[in-house]
Amino acid sequence: MKKSPTDGFVDIHHHLIYGLDDGAQTWEQTQQMLTRAGENGIRRIIATPHAEPGMRPFPMRELMERIRQAREWCIQQGMQLEILPGCEIFYTPQTVRMLRDGLIPTLAESEFVLVEFLPTVPYRELRSAAKALTAAGYMPIFAHIERYRCLRWPGRVRKLKRDFSVCMQMNADTICRKHSFFSQRWVNAVIQKGYVDFAATDSHNVTSRACRMRACYRELQQRFGEQTAERLCIVNPAEIQ
């Protein structure tokens, strides 16, 4: 069933769980980020602390305990905000094995996995990661695709989607900000062509990297139409559960 804006936004990329990465550092900061998310009309968040397979152990127990703490606080505050577990995986050769062994979580216990790379990642490594993840039965979502320089070459985003069914996530702040001529043209093109599947906040705090989902929705609505705004902020993200 089609979602409407009244159902609320779904944010699949959010660093609100304190003490696990470079996002929220304290319980008070988590509370502030939850409040900001609610003010932005978000009704479901997938918590995505950084995971670095083979480089450091993932704090699964702490993640689940602090998600439970955040859920209880939201109930006490009367906030209708669902919080689900996940992570943002820095792709390494150990990623598939650690996913299979349950050492790092998928998004909301689904087959979707949020994966990031260095901005200078070669295109062949993106293809290799996509191939390995899909062969193992996962649905890769490449996080903040605007950062990867190799994807600025014509046709490369399309080929990844065609060959491996990779989903693409763009940060809300990227959609809201103005860019240089060629960067703006690329951002507009990948959205207009339907290559971007998710808009997400990648929020780390309430100041320099704050949640801007409502502003992102308005920007998409004004520049690309209501259908695109709903698809990126509501409909597609709601399928991950």
Which residues make up each language-model segment?
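Extended substrate/RNA-proximal surfaces in nucleic-acid metabolism proteins
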Residues: P57-Q169
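An N-terminally biased module of ancient metal coordination in phosphate/nucleic-acid-related enzymes
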Residues: M1-M79
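Short acidic/histidine-rich active-site segments
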Residues: Y195-C211
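Non-catalytic positions within long, well-ordered alpha-helices that form the structural scaffold/packing
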Residues: G38, T134, I191-Q192
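Active-site beta-loop-alpha junctions enriched in small/polar residues
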Residues: H15-I17, H50-A51, G86-F90, L118-T120, ...
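Mid-to-C-terminal alpha-helical segments outside catalytic/metal-binding sites
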Residues: M213, Y217-Q241
